[in-house]
Amino acid sequence: KDCSVWDDKGQEYLDLYGGHAVISIGHCHPHYVEALARQAAELGFYSNSVVNMLQRRLAERLGKACGYEDYQLFLINSGAEANENAMKLASFKTGRTRVLSAVKAFHGRTSLAVEATDNAKIIAPVNANGHVTYLPLNDLAAWEAELAKGDVCACIIECIQGVGGIRMATEEFAQGLQAACKRHGAVLVCDEIQCGYGRSGRFFAHQWLGIRPDLITVAKGIANGFPMGAVLISPDFKPEYGQLGTTFGGNHMACAAALAVLDVM
């Protein structure tokens, strides 16, 4: 409950972990519990072939809360899925296949997301496809040199690295990288999965750095533990019917959870 957890012997602990930065409004928040129970009693799931008004409400509410009202919202089930779809969109938009990621980055454990993660132990041979180049965070010259080659579809960064050791991008680097991406036709992706949703004192960590990325990925705190991920998509991306898809993403229960989180925040 709230910031406390108990073990099987009744010992209470102050939870400073939050389930790996997931519990954004506390355990068993009464408004959250009530919202999920109410939604489960009404409709737990239906296909995305039918318009889900909860998705529209969430897109509007989240856009206003984070300052990206003009961005589109694509909903999925996890952070890895969010990053997969962000990099997929970048490749569609640019027609390119190469990604720049930071040394010590963590972006997920699937397909291209794991290839963009700087940890050889979790990259299976089938995932090592040579699409990703790792560069030191805050070494702007190194990123500019790679972008100048003209084959990069996306630069993906955590503005505050989590697994990488709470290392923050500098304002000079972030703004310079954004300018270089625009200059060379690449897409800037900010992975806000762990550092976003108010965790840094602003809604997104990149908002301390004076940049406005093309794509923003979120998960973890978005639904307080209910599986959900999302990509906020710049209006520069023209929607194409059927380009992205998901069975469970943005389901009624997940949307109810995410809306309850925004209510409390």
Language-model features and meaning:
Residues 1-265:
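Conserved N-terminal phosphate-binding loop of PLP-dependent enzymes in the Aspartate aminotransferase
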